Amino acid sequence: MFVNLTCLSEGNGSRGKALAESTQAELKTSWYLLGPAFVAAIAYVDPGNVAANVSSGAQFGYLQLWVVVVANVLAGLVQYLSAKLGLVTGQSLPQAISKQMSHPFRLGFWLQAELVAMATDVAEIVGGAIAFHILFRVSLLLGGVITGTVSLLLLMVKDRRGQLLFERVITGLLFVIVVGFTSSFFVATPSPEDMVNGLLPRFQGTESVLLAAAIIGATVMPHAVYLHSGLALDRHGHPHAGRSRRRLLRVTRLDVILAMTIAGIVNTAMLLVAAINLQHHQVTAYIEGTYTAIQDTLGATIAMLFAIGLLASSLASASVGAYAGALIMQGLLQRSIPMLIRRLITLCPAIAILALGFDPTRALVLSQIVLSFGIPFAVLPLVKLTNNRGLMGNDTNHPATTVLGWAVAILVSLLNVVLIYLTVTS
């Protein structure tokens, strides 16, 4: 009996050790599989977010902090559904949409998506131009050209060295963004009590209600919704139903949670910096004015880090936006063109705006209007497709997820209508 118990104990110990080693190996592999969501998350820390969050913090202090948190949670759900669609169906969102349409409708859908891609480029290129102007005192036009060129080089990294290296470069830029926008906390720390109060949903007059609607409505970016499905598919392929797919979906959920948490921290930091240092400053109507205010209140070093964060945001988001544009064209039209030509198509409007001396702040505002028009065309089909059992099989959305998805899709679409109205009337 003693010998048998000993053998049994040794057997259990061996199996336990093997299980532990297997779990550890799986965890290591899971960390290796992370990345697509970090690329998509760049859309949530672009120059448009900088302007919106800084403006909110400067006007209302900590009041809108809960809005930023809610917006990132809603965006996280949408991004997961997009990645899930790619893994389960083996199609990007543009490809899946195109198969539901006749040719004329598909062409029209592509035209609006292409306008969204161009509007995205305007925001990123203008933001990069402003950052280069702040850091190196070059003209806005030259700054825009440099931003476009660097973004093209980043895309060449993807084409020649693969998606994994591209993801690592973009993730590196994301952490530069984190440092750039959180460094001010080493000089001025936010009040924990005020932060807790800022997490309590409430408003302060009609203007705060409208601004909250604008923040949520401007958070979900259509190009990121299209892109994430393609990123997940390119990175993980189309796994067969079963253990492999379930594991990749778990990894994808972790990927989205981590990436959107980082994006949420950055957006929160933008608002808190403004709430602590820029309240009552009449400088937040344009990004360069925000830099000046930070320099006056926190010093040249923190202001420089802010500008570097803005530059990293612009470079990363410009390359990710161009990647999304190529994915959209390939998915909807079933054709692709060389990346250089593709990049020039979407880059030209942004460079033309800078060359003509158009006010960069107004260009950012107008680009957000165009982006707002594109939101329903990306989010509503996504929820419908991921709830299609014929397409998704056993991985179709849970009924609760479907209800929440439709609620988010309709809410974000309506809030973008509000955003358009507010922008036009102001």
From Swiss-Prot:
It is a multi-pass membrane protein. It holds the Pfam family Nramp. One of its GO terms (biological process) is iron ion transmembrane transport. The chain crosses the membrane at residues 31-51, 58-78, 134-156, 169-189, 208-228, 256-276, 298-318, 337-357, 363-383, 402-422. It is found in: Cell membrane. Keywords: Cell membrane, Ion transport, Membrane, Symport, Transmembrane, Transmembrane helix, Transport. GO terms for molecular function: cadmium ion transmembrane transporter activity; manganese ion transmembrane transporter activity; metal ion binding; symporter activity. GO terms for cellular component: plasma membrane. Belongs to the NRAMP family. This is Divalent metal cation transporter MntH. The lineage of its organism: Bacteria, Bacillati, Actinomycetota, Actinomycetes, Mycobacteriales. The gene is mntH.
